[in-house]
UniProtKB/Swiss-Prot annotation:
It comes from Oryza sativa subsp. japonica. PANTHER family: FLAVIN MONOAMINE OXIDASE, LYSINE-SPECIFIC HISTONE DEMETHYLASE 1 HOMOLOG 1. Probable histone demethylase. Its cofactor is FAD. This is Lysine-specific histone demethylase 1 homolog 1. InterPro entries: Amino_oxidase (IPR002937), FAD/NAD-bd_sf (IPR036188), Flavin_monoamine_oxidase (IPR050281), Homeodomain-like_sf (IPR009057), SWIRM (IPR007526), WH-like_DNA-bd_sf (IPR036388).
Amino acid sequence: MEEGSEAQPPLQPEAVSAEASEPPPPVPMDQDEGQAAAAEAMEGEAEGAAAAAGTIEGEAGYAAADADPMEDEAADEAGAAEPMEDDPPTSSAPSATAAVDDSTIARKRRRRKKQFPGMIPTAGVRVLRAAASAPSAAHLNGVPRRRGRPPTSSSLRLARELDAEALIALAAGFPADSLSEDEVAAAVLPRIGGVDQTNYLVVRNHVLALWRSNPLSPVASNAALASIRAEHAHLVAAAHSFLSDHAYINFGLAPSVISLPPCPPPSLPPPSVLIVGAGFAGLAAARHLMSLGFKVAIVEGRLRPGGRVFTKSMRSTAAEYPDIAAAADLGGSVLTGINGNPLGVIARQLGFPLHKVRDKCPLYLPDGRPVDPDMDARVEAAFNQLLDKVCQLRQVVADSIPHGVDVSLGMALEAFRAAHGVAAEREERMLLDWHLANLEYANAAPLVDLSMAFWDQDDPYEMGGDHCFIPGGNSRFVRALADGIPIFYGQNVRRIQYGCDGAMVYTDKQTFRGDMVLCTVPLGVLKKGNIQFVPELPAQKREAIERLGFGLLNKVVLLFPYDFWDGRIDTFGHLTEDSGQRGEFFLFYSYSSVSGGPLLIALVAGESAIEFEKTSPAENVEKVLETLRKIFSPKGIEVPKPLQAICTRWGTDKFTYGSYSYVAIGSSGDDYDILAESVCDRVFFAGEATNRRYPATMHGALLSGYREAANIVRAARRRAKKVDSPKKMDVNNEVKYEVKVDNIDLDDLFRTPDAAFGGFSVLHDPSTSEPDSISLLRVGIGARKLGSGSLFLYGLIMRKNVANLAAMEGDEQRLSTLYRDFGTKLVGLDGLGDSGSSLISRIKAAARK
């Protein structure tokens, strides 16, 4: 995938290469503390948090590298206006010039999904209030719970505090008046219901609100107890433990959070976890597991972290414009809904400014004329009515047919359109096609492929608040999240094998062994079957992988010498005469105000996104320029040649095979849950396609990583409670593995090594002292302090080379020399081969004497 950068046609823009030229070696040292600049609060958590139960779908998320999409593209912010999921642009025509007329109607960009009546409770948000009668010692009731508050304090103020805290919890994804599924699974209370549950919910909401009020400083359990009565200390401990384990509090990249010492691991030696994929899900899980005392390493196929979140630096090579440059998000690009969004918390911790997406989105006819405002409003209303008709139809089907029936959303919409004579005129039909293309953009799929019954199943969980962009691109998140995490780049995973004694990850270069594996690869990779699971995954999971859809969205990114389209708008749309090409360059985003340069991005959705990859990049760029000329030439505005152009190719990217997930015909939200299920407490799954509430979003991927980190912790604790025994265990009722028992622990032997320097330690062959004899090398990867939270990898090295390694300055130089000069590969113990096994046997035999 090469990127094109020539200013004159023929341009050679191909899907940009997301890889670095040389994979950085794993860093076996102390984890650096990420610098986090404190910023003003940007998240009005409680303010409008009720929208979390409403409809603002936070959308697309992941994004791509190389062109990994997961296009979170949705909304722009101060400049890159990508549409917001939930509501489609609603604007009227622009003025005769490129400038935006004040009369232009605000168009909510990016209709992801429509919120239908009855999909969420209509009685409003239910919050916990103080009991008005018979105060008891057990209740957090009308008696002030804040210590030191005068007894004359108004109970109304307490009720308001409880309401505000419940709204914050709601925005973070918790039920307002019941335990979440995760809380039930974690057994936060001995029994469900009753007084303890009521009080626990108030305490949980309070602890969460304390954290969200100041995420720059961790919330300690005793700090929460300072404002809660002592008799409820057990509830504070339960809530604090749950929220910490699941990264609802004390997560992120604030210096005070990073500097916290790791928690004691559930067992010794600490459990080890191999994570496949360094996207948002993998990075979030790795960082959280390390904070909980686990040994962690990430295996990544690309030569960079981030997965489908990738910011490409674009720069002019033209002599007359030497200083023009911009940062372009080729994949996920928008924070969709800031209330409750963990990325909003991390942005605040790092001091990243957030830019609200502007709503105006003028539309243009194929000949460049602006769309008539009255017709625009009329057709949009008709479009919404069509969606309402589909909603009514599926309700009738659900009520009348026991097991329901699923058909194509596109087919249902077209049937109602034809039956009611909607958009019969030519221009009306073009405008309706634009709205349909916008819907295809939101779902990364042609409407004909979407499930009529469940395509919008995640609407009730949308996060409220503004849709925002991060100036400079979302790779700023990636760099901060990846800092200090051991990542092995350029490792294409071929097989994941698991049994009762652990799991192994086989790449085309090395073999890794751990206690558990977390797989975060995109759904497109799972669909291709490029990774073999041994034993085979359960049939239910394989069927869910088959049923769920994984769609496609592409972009054409253009760096111009100057902004000719008027930076006062973030988005503008273009209508097409051919319904079959309605998704081709239907929406443009201006990133001028957030990218650092005059950057314009054209979106390609639906069937057009598929056809786009069959056409050469140069031809696609010329098509975009022709479209822009039709819009701006009638206004007397010349469209200059781009200084650099990039076309994404998400569908053919071997690390994604698409952009992000959608609910296909025959699928449902249940399939997201099935994908999230672990196998034998050894193999776990994360990523946007495992998040039923927030699929196709960056925050959905991040949250899934935190979720699985908590599940891994629970699994490790369960395992630690069991007494080790040499029993056989069934794995999927198919394959049996024998637990290995060895009365000599290699970890004990490495406590007194023959040589130790930095993160390296060595055991020599006890049967010989020849310089050319082989020694066993162990490297601690990702240790804050050697032996604490580190993952150990092994290699074979000649005894005479040990002194050379020890004399070098720093472990990075040692690793580089190890790979380049000595040809030593670092692997798990089982990857050392016969020579390694024989050497270990001799070392252990000598230790027994």
